Amino acid sequence: MANINIPDDLVSKYSEDVKDLTQKAGSIPSSKSLIPQTAFTPDELRRSLKFWQVTTKVAATVASDWTNLATALTNGTFSATHLRTLCELAFNLKAPTGTGTIFIHEIADPWKGCIDANAPDTVAIPATDSDVNMSTVSSGSTASGTEDAEVKMKAISFLCCTLLRLSVKEPSHIMQAINSIRQRFGSLYGVSSPTLNSVTFNRSQLSRIKQGIETYPSARGTVFYYTRYADATHGYTTKEYGICRFLLFQHLELEGMHIYKMLLALLGEWSTVPIGLLLTWIRNPRSKLAINEIVKIVKELDKPEVDKGWKYARMVNNTFFLDLSSRRNTYLCAVLASLNKKNVPQGSGEYADPTNIAVIKNMDQSVKSQVATDVTLIERIYEKYLVSAGGDEAGTAYALSRGVKRSSPPSQEGGQSGQSGGTPMEVDGASGRGAAGPAPKKTRSGL
């Protein structure tokens, strides 16, 4: 099949009976069966948003509220009322030093109209997992005496913030992360908490929390609003930002915007490549809408002076940024995932393999093979760009090992250039900038 010649004129030649049908899919209404994307604007975001206002709680109230919430989880009576309490406990999180809170603030006028003042219902939220075996374990440490009330308050809020990851994570995430949560609390706050060390959950309990967040828009809106506020308020170098980054930011930001998230990760490693050039290398005929959305984000939204709400907006309205989802860009998603796996340091557990997602695993093997070919070509293009772009980014060994040339430094008098007669060394694939001597050889990685 690969040897069959296809004449150029046949590619654009219509059959006689369909020669007038020049429409493309975009102009045929019935072809648009996908849910339409909602264009993101701050006003459109606020029109969709409802959230519960969080006010300051004292340590004794935090402790008693947690006891009631934990009892409801154990008894199967956990409701939207308890879910609101969970949000209130989470966003009463104290700063590591001093007495201030990280999230609570005076709500600005543009957001006041989004506050949901109605009392949540008390109907029990159903569990979506029947496993009632304890899936998280106690650390095994025992308390010596009564736990300090302020320490207990900080630990409860820290734990509740972690539970709000269930907005986007599965119960298994909490079960796997519980030891890390305990350790990080100790390192951030400089103290250990018996309450945090002894807490346990099962899948059924955690599934009620997740189901509640998915059911009640005001719950998602509350997580969105206070996360957005913290991201916009605390500078990158502060301890407050570091805590929020660990607890929420890294898990919630750019959720569902897989294409942009993986693109940023790759750019972090290929930092000398302009984003427009990288997009040119990786795009394909079906990626136009995703590329357009990325251009808009880079030009209008992903800027220091712009409110961070866009990063978390899909928690409020999941039709925002749909054109950046993996399901609408399966091929581009596979290319970026493979590039990330090969070039970006990966985490462990659920973060270990960016290609381990359904839309990629379900691809036909022939398509996966084509993706692998594209990825190899993109990496070769990058290597050639890195060396040919000049500067010191590509070291001598890096250039030599890839068969791409670098221009040598000018020769010095007395044969100090390292070659007899003062002739500059030729490196395979040299561009010829400032080089003398023999004509360059054909590059091994040239395209």
Curated annotation (Swiss-Prot):
Ribonucleoprotein in keyword set: yes
Cellular component terms per the entry's GO annotation: helical viral capsid; host cell cytoplasm; ribonucleoprotein complex; viral nucleocapsid
A Gene Ontology molecular function term of the record: RNA binding
Region (Disordered): 401-447
Keywords carried by this UniProt record: Capsid protein, Helical capsid protein, Host cytoplasm, Ribonucleoprotein, RNA-binding, Superantigen, Viral nucleoprotein, Virion
Domain of life from the UniProt record: Viruses
Subcellular location: Virion; Host cytoplasm
KW Plastid (keyword) present: no
InterPro entries recorded: Rhabdo_ncap_2
Disulfide bond positions: none
Record note on quaternary structure: Homomultimerizes to form the nucleocapsid. Binds to viral genomic RNA.
Family: Belongs to the nucleorhabdovirus nucleocapsid protein family.
Known role: Encapsidates the genome, protecting it from nucleases. If expressed without protein P it binds non-specifically RNA and therefore can bind it's own mRNA. Interaction with protein P abolishes any non-specific RNA binding, and prevents phosphorylation. The soluble N-P complex encapsidates specifically the genomic RNA, with protein N protecting the genome like a pearl necklace. The encapsidated genomic RNA is termed the nucleocapsid (NC) and serves as template for viral transcription and replication. Protein N binds protein P in the NC through a different interaction, and can be phosphorylated.
Protein name: Nucleoprotein
Organism the protein comes from: Maize mosaic virus (isolate Maize/United States/Reed/2005)
Underlying gene: N
